[in-house]
Swiss-Prot record:
This is Proline--tRNA ligase. It is found in: Cytoplasm. It comes from Leptospira biflexa serovar Patoc (strain Patoc 1 / ATCC 23582 / Paris). Homodimer. The keyword Acyltransferase does not apply. The gene is proS. The lineage of its organism: Bacteria, Pseudomonadati, Spirochaetota, Spirochaetia, Leptospirales. It catalyses: tRNA(Pro) + L-proline + ATP = L-prolyl-tRNA(Pro) + AMP + diphosphate. Consists of three domains: the N-terminal catalytic domain, the editing domain and the C-terminal anticodon-binding domain. The keyword Nucleotide-binding applies. Pfam families: HGTP_anticodon (PF03129), tRNA-synt_2b (PF00587), tRNA_edit (PF04073). GO terms for cellular component: cytosol.
Length: 586
């Protein structure tokens, strides 16, 4: 491809609304353009990268036995109501009505659609297992689209769904997909960590997210440096360490704490640690009033509580609701009014024999020396793990102190179980002729997000340096010749590269060499060959490795010699990727 007949709309300055490297560089390198909030158009260079990522996903999915489909983006409300998710999906779902007043949505995911499609096609255990997938457009009305294509309202997803006779078969496919995902991400140059995760609205018995460690990540990962346990902080169990010693607050009875409502303010005022305070959090779950008690240095893990309750909505209790129940905001403690309408949950981390500082049930007052046994009978309350894990907590596997990292989620796999199979009555006859409900798995990859995440990992002050497997072009040929005879000579080299199968972009634009160099470094072609004065005088070319910015020179005698040299260099880059893929699949 010649740059003079291609579209390369690069820019020197970062877009004003871009805050992360991938968003800035995708815009500056001419890969995408913003159409509206959370909506992006892919330009030719960007689309080449996207298609290569899709190709890696497709190749590995097919190798793992996946069967590719393409379903409608527009899905009828009936199937969502049948699964019970029409209301659960909330405002993130784009909903619309046609001219006949029929409700539909733009699919944010396709469990329901695939269930309806597959159901009449699987009748016997001999038809299972089956793993179906598509690489298609999805829509989610994100409340705050951000970071360019990392969190957008329209995106490309690879979503796969497997159907099985039993859990043993599901587990086998789940493990196959786990390895397949590691290979997929390694194939595009990403280093991922699989972490235990919350299943959310998807439901099911287990799930794992594939995370890329990054300071811009929206998720927090808990990682054990000893046994390599890893989990999303929303899912990580908090292990009780009764051997840890606490510094007991020296005092008992009523304390005046003027204008001190937050845990931090009270702890500082009383010169004690936050863990010595008893925190009360008042929430409403699907209309049910709930009061949660935690140690003062802990945060409520809303996902854990929602999963325990099985609720759709969890929100803070409002001032009027608290007043109605006789609760004093910021000062809830012993003697608060108990009622049938208020359920109590106690975090499992709380020590029933420890003397805490609790709210005094009146403004500007707390009480020291409070034990849980003085407030509750254990049979009156529910004790569960509902606090957020934090750095230093014991690893749930080996007890070593946990560390934390920020991460970007690029993939998610689920054991869905029979949630959707039962909703849609997907049954097959087993080997004894008895009707058996199938069990399911679900496996998703955010294709656009992968592209941006690669850039987050592969950039420097000059721009992007693409892994060879997904680069828009493998080689950028930069020439400075203007003499027709010299240009004709370069043309023969260009044709030799193209005919050999090398993906090459010849920057033949009528621009200065400095401009061309900056563009090639910004866009991030893995290899750049420069045909300058040395080429015109003695067939000498300069070869640049974009990632390391290392240069070497080659004096060649024939075009075939040049092609052979470049192919060797490209194969070395490819072998590095292939080695990572091979290791990831073990």
């Amino acid at each position: 491809m010649k740059a003079s007949s291609y579209l390369i709309p690069t820019a020197k300055e970062d877009p004003q609304d871009a805050v992360v490297a991938s968003h800035k560089l995708m815009m500056r390198a001419g890969l995408i353009r913003k159409s509206a909030a959370g909506l992006y158009s892919y330009l030719p260079l960007g689309l080449r990268v996207l298609r290569k990522i899709e190709g890696i996903v497709r190749k590995e999915m097919d190798k793992a036995g996946g069967l590719e489909f393409q379903l409608p983006i527009l899905t009828p409300s009936e199937i969502w109501k049948e699964s019970g998710r029409w209301d659960k999906m909330g405002k993130e779902m784009f909903r619309l009505k046609d001219r006949h007043d029929n409700e539909s949505c733009l699919g944010p995911t396709h469990e329901e659609s695939f269930c309806v499609l597959v159901k009449p096609m699987v009748r016997s255990y001999k038809d299972l297992p089956i793993n179906v997938y598509q690489i298609h457009t999805k829509f989610r009305d994100e409340i705050r689209p951000r970071f360019g294509v990392i969190r957008s309202r329209e995106f490309t997803m690879k979503d796969a769904y497997s159907f099985h006779l039993d859990d043993e078969s599901l587990d086998k496919t789940y493990q196959t997909m786990r390895k397949t995902y590691r290979r997929i991400f390694a194939g595009m140059g990403l280093t991922t960590i699989p972490v235990q995760a919350d299943s959310g609205n998807m439901g099911g018995s287990a799930s794992e997210e594939f995370m890329v460690v990054s300071p811009i990540g929206e998720e927090t990962l808990t990682i054990c440096p000893s046994c390599h346990y890893s989990g999303n902080i929303e899912k990580t169990p908090v292990i009780v360490n009764r051997n840890a010693t606490k510094q007991v607050f020296d005092g008992k009875g009523k304390l005046h704490t003027p204008a001190k409502k937050s845990i931090t303010e009270v702890a500082e005022f009383l010169n004690t640690k936050e863990e010595n305070l008893l925190k009360a959090v008042a929430v409403v779950a699907d209309g049910q009033y709930i009061l949660v008690f935690l140690e003062g240095d802990r945060e409520l893990n809303e996902n854990k509580l929602k999963n325990h309750l099985g609720c759709n909505e969890l929100r803070p209790m409002g001032p009027a609701e608290m007043e109605k129940l006789g609760l004093v905001p910021g000062f809830i403690g012993p003697g608060f009014p108990k009622s049938e309408s208020l359920k109590i949950y106690i975090d499992a981390l709380l020590d029933w024999n420890f003397s805490y500082i609790a709210g005094g049930n009146e403004i500007d007052h707390h009480i020291a020396g409070v034990q849980l046994t003085s407030i509750f009978k254990e049979e009156e309350v529910t004790k569960i793990d509902i606090s957020q894990a934090k750095v230093g907590d014991p690893c749930p596997s080996c007890g070593t102190g946990l560390t934390a990292e920020k991460g970007i989620e690029v993939g998610h796999i689920f054991k869905l179980g029979q949630k959707y199979s039962k909703a849609f009555d997907i049954t097959v006859l087993n080997d004894k002729g008895k009707a058996t409900t199938t069990t399911m798995g679900c496996y998703g990859i955010g294709v656009n997000r992968c592209m941006a995440t690669v850039i987050e990992q592969c950039n420097d002050e000059k721009g992007i340096f693409w892994p060879v497997s997904i680069a828009p072009f493998t080689v950028c040929l930069v020439s400075i010749a203007k003499n027709p005879d010299d240009i004709a000579k370069i043309e023969t080299i260009y044709k030799s590269l193209v005919e050999s199968g090398i993906e090459v972009l010849w920057d033949d634009r009528d621009l200065g060499p400095g401009f061309k160099f900056k563009d090639s470094e910004l866009i991030g072609f893995p290899i750049r060959i420069t045909l300058g004065k040395g080429f015109l005088e003695k067939n000498e070319i300069t070869i640049l490795d974009r990632k390391s910015m290392a240069e070497d020179t080659l004096v060649y005698t024939t075009n075939e010699e040049l092609v052979t040299h470049l192919k060797l260099k490209i194969s070395q880059l490819e072998e590095t990727i292939e080695k990572e893929v091979s290791l990831a699949g073990t």
